[in-house]
């Protein structure tokens, strides 16, 4: 027997390791046998005259031998357990590596809660630019007249190969991150400290600019008087207020656009009532009251419930698996627990009379809630399911028959379904009818179809036909596709067919079974058929809880096979069927809206992130950064959905996701913001201290220019007298003759195009293709790869060297940077009046204003008007 077990074990993964173990074990057993034999001989020789002692010694030795055999078997089992454990670890590692949904349930629930999107507003205006002054003159003395200029607020363009296009893309993304859903100027307005009439100005930054300008010693009197006249204007008739704001033209255009395109809508009790799903609103078991009274200035941001535009169920197996698993974990929290069940001890006594061989009594006693939550949760989340059972346990197989009665085959894992169907056919149906065993054929899944053709008994054949043709219905409710059980299952009438089949099956001869075993099987089937009324009530209870919770699903339901499955023990199904009572349980009202809210928040966040990444793809494409940015864009999009681990998604699915996102049109607000930024690109470039508008090249050395605010520098602010050639046009055409000809004529030229001050690519890509004989002297004088502006800083606060003002030495250069003049700040031209509603209140969580109670006792199922369970 031991050797047979060993031959089986050699089929395991670590065959060589087991072989070594076997050799050691055989050697130990052989030595033990020889030792026992020697002991027997010694005992016989020494105790010839005492046969009783010899017998006792022999029994002792036999016991020792049996203990040794048991020890060897234990070692063998431990080896098997180790191998199985190692296999489990390997499988677990594979799942961790390739399935992004591998995480704890608590973490999934937490991430689901984090997906909530709050209405985005701000207490200050959006600004790309701010005001800056140059306080020192060229000779190091403080200026008597201060000049103020508009400068870029987030001027963080790094040196090197970083393109100005990438800078504008990051600038655009920054605008998208801060783009508000609504704006209320009244909340951000502050007092104007210099107002003659206690007026207000729009925000703190505008106030800071006022203070700096007012405190400037050289600010003229008419400017101070103008600042004292700045105040807000209120119109009570229209409930609007106008506030003065000090803004750059680009910021003014953006903020006015945000004010005109707010997402908020007026809020009334009707809006809240419309948020309640129609099915719940008309459910006789729930009473909804909206006690809050909302004023005319109440506002809310409607949820963004556009249906899945990517199609996660089609071609994204890893992502779909992660989403459905998260949905399953979330849905189970809201399925109610069964209460007032039948006494388990009494039921088990009846079942023990059937000589049932249950794998786990613990599962039998405590599995009813697990099975109840499992059935409802898997359909709500459209998860693939698998049933674990023991073929010899006919009570579990009968419970599986009930599961096949109410659950279509499309939701089962194919392998699990085939195994379950074969077990039911070969253990119950065919032996009852005296038919030969059905054998499995590779790839053949039509087990019950074949059985239907061979079975002549009408009730059994009707049940088989029902299982073969059972499918979920698809019902569109308020634009959302939901899975629906058939009418027979919803009303519980299908249990009559199930019960009739059980009675017909139990009355069959079971000719091939021994008499005791036959009676046990028939007793088990009769035990189930005697609970027909309770099973019918259970079916109605399952369907009612499912349909009630499914009304809270706001995303189309698609029944697609998942990579991982949810498993249930058949003994848990038996526990549910045998211990269910006539006590009705329905979802708690508070949990109902919590489930509804979590689904709304996820879909809203999902749509917002789609719009963001689509806008980013559009911007990257328009800025010629499409190829560089795609993988990063898609990865960031997936990670922002909270329930996915982006690095674990296979590359083919990421590329497919990229292609789907690329075909989605850009949302209007995001497209308009990009248009505003691109239309004002030149203005933004001029305000940056890190971006220049081109490079000046000369064959002969040129003296450095004198700039009032900077000093001697190789930065040129004026293009007069220079030939201008566009860098991008040269790169597109590939014709560099214009540059060569100009340099040969010793005519200074400007290669115009936005580049960083410090660069080693944008200019070099062009200059490296020019005739080296013409350009050699320029390269010799200055390293173009490290082109920087030469600024001789003359500053009394600086520890750098000083340049004597009357020094006759004039520095020269053959390269210079072309930088357009920054826009000078003029307060009278920079003040704009922004208008918004004077006062309104935005409500975020609308469901807290709905008071929901349940009717006791529970009235009826909303489908057919009959009671869910026949309570006594």
UniProtKB/Swiss-Prot annotation:
Annotated GO CC locations: T=2 icosahedral viral capsid; viral inner capsid; viral nucleocapsid
Native organism taxonomy: Viruses, Riboviria, Orthornavirae, Duplornaviricota, Resentoviricetes
Keywords tagged on the record: Capsid protein, Inner capsid protein, RNA-binding, T=2 icosahedral capsid protein, Virion
Functional note: Inner capsid protein that self-assembles to form an icosahedral capsid with a T=2 symmetry, which consists of 120 copies of VP2, with channels at each of its five-fold vertices. This capsid constitutes the innermost concentric layer of the viral mature particle. It encapsidates the polymerase VP1, the capping enzyme VP3 and the genomic dsRNA, thereby defining the core.
Superkingdom, taxonomy of origin: Viruses
Protein name: Inner capsid protein VP2
Composition bias, Basic residues: 1-10
Location, primary (coarse class): virion
Family membership: Belongs to the rotavirus VP2 family.
Molecular-function annotations in GO: RNA binding
Keyword Lipid biosynthesis listed: no
InterPro entries: Rotavirus_VP2
Subcellular location: Virion
Region (Disordered) residue spans: 1-57
Biased composition (Basic and acidic residues): 11-56
Subunit text: Homodecamer; each decamer is made up of two conformers of VP2, called VP2A and VP2B. Interacts with a VP1-VP3 complex. Interacts with the intermediate capsid protein VP6. Interacts with NSP5. Interacts (via N-terminus) with NSP2.
Signal peptide limits: none
């Amino acid at each position: 027997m031991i050797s047979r077990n060993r031959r089986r074990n050699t089929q395991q993964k670590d065959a060589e390791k087991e072989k070594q173990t076997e050799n050691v074990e055989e050697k130990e057993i052989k030595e033990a046998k020889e030792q026992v034999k020697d002991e027997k001989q010694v005992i016989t020789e020494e105790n010839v005259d005492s046969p009783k002692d010899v017998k006792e010694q022999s029994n002792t030795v036999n016991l020792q031998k049996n203990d040794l055999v048991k020890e060897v078997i234990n070692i063998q089992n431990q080896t098997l357990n180790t191998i199985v454990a190692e296999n489990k670890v390997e499988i677990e590692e594979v799942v961790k590596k390739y399935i992004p949904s591998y995480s704890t349930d608590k973490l999934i629930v937490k991430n689901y809660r984090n997906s909530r999107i709050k209405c985005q507003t701000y207490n200050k205006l959006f600004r790309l630019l701010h005001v800056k002054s140059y306080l020192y003159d060229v000779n190091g003395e403080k200026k008597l007249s201060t000049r103020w200029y508009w400068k870029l607020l987030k001027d963080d363009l790094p040196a090197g190969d970083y393109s100005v296009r990438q800078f504008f893309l990051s600038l655009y993304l920054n605008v998208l991150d801060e783009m508000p859903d609504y704006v209320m100027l009244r909340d951000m307005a502050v007092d104007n400290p210099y107002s003659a009439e206690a007026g207000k100005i729009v925000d703190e930054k505008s106030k800071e600019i006022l203070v700096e300008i007012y405190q400037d010693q050289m600010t003229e009197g008419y400017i101070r008087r103008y600042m004292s006249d700045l105040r807000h204007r209120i119109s009570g008739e229209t409930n609007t207020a106008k506030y003065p704001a000090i803004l750059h033209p680009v910021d003014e255009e953006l903020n006015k656009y945000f004010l005109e395109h707010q997402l908020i809508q007026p809020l009334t009790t009707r809006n809240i009532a419309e948020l309640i799903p129609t099915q719940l609103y008309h459910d006789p078991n729930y009473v909804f009251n909206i006690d809050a009274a909302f004023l005319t200035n109440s506002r809310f941001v409607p949820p963004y419930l556009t249906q899945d535009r990517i199609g996660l169920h089609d071609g994204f197996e890893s992502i779909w698996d992660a989403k459905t698993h998260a949905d399953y974990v979330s849905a189970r929290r809201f399925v109610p627990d069964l209460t007032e069940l039948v006494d388990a001890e009494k039921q088990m006594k009846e079942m023990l009379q059937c000589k049932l061989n249950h794998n786990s009594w613990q599962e039998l006693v405590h599995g009813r809630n697990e099975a109840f939550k499992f059935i409802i949760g898997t359909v709500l989340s459209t998860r693939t399911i698998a049933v674990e059972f023991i073929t010899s346990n006919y009570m579990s197989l009968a419970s599986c028959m009930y599961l096949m009665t109410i659950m279509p085959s499309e939701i089962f894992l194919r392998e699990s379904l085939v195994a379950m169907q074969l077990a039911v056919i070969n253990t119950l149906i065919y032996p009852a009818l005296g038919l030969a065993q059905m054998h499995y054929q590779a790839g053949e899944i039509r087990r019950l179809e074949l059985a239907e053709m061979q079975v002549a008994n009408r009730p059994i054949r009707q049940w088989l036909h029902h299982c073969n043709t059972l499918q979920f219905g698809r019902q569109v409710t308020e634009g959302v596709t939901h899975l629906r059980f058939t009418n027979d299952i919803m009303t519980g009438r299908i249990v009559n067919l199930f019960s009739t089949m059980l009675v017909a099956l139990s009355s069959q001869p079971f000719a091939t079974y021994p008499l005791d075993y036959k009676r046990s099987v028939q007793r088990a089937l009769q035990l189930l058929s005697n609970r027909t009324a309770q099973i019918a009530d259970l079916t109605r209870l399952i369907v009612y809880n499912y349909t009630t919770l499914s009304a809270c699903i706001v995303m189309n339901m698609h029944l697609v096979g998942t990579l991982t499955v949810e498993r249930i023990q058949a003994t848990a199904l038996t526990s549910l069927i045998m211990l269910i009572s006539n006590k009705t349980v329905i979802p708690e009202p508070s949990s109902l809206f919590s489930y509804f809210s979590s689904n709304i928040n996820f879909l809203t966040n999902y749509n917002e992130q789609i719009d963001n990444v689509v806008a980013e793809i559009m911007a990257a494409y328009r800025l010629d950064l499409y190829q560089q940015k795609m993988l990063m864009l898609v990865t960031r999009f997936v990670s922002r959905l909270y329930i996915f681990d982006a690095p674990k998604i296979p590359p083919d699915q990421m590329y497919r996701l990229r292609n789907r996102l690329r075909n989605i049109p850009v949302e209007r607000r995001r497209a308009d913001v990009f248009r505003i930024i691109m239309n004002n690109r030149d203005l933004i470039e001029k305000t940056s201290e890190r971006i220049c508008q081109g490079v000046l090249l000369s064959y002969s050395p040129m003296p450095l220019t004198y700039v009032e605010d900077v000093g001697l520098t190789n930065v040129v602010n004026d293009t007069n007298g220079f030939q201008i050639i566009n860098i991008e046009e040269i790169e597109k055409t590939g014709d560099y003759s214009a540059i060569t000809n100009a340099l040969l004529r010793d005519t200074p030229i400007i290669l115009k195009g936005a580049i960083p001050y410090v660069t080693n690519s944008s200019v070099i890509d062009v200059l490296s293709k020019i005739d080296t004989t013409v350009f050699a002297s320029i390269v010799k004088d200055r390293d173009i790869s490290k082109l920087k502006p030469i600024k001789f800083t003359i500053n009394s606060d600086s520890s750098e060297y000083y340049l004597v003002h009357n020094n006759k030495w004039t520095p020269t250069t053959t390269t210079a940077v072309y930088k357009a003049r920054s826009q000078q700040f003029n307060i009278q031209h920079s003040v704009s009046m922004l208008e918004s509603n004077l006062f309104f209140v935005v409500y975020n969580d609308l469901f807290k204003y709905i008071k929901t109670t349940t009717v006791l006792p529970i009235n009826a199922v909303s489908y057919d008007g009959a009671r869910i369970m026949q309570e006594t």
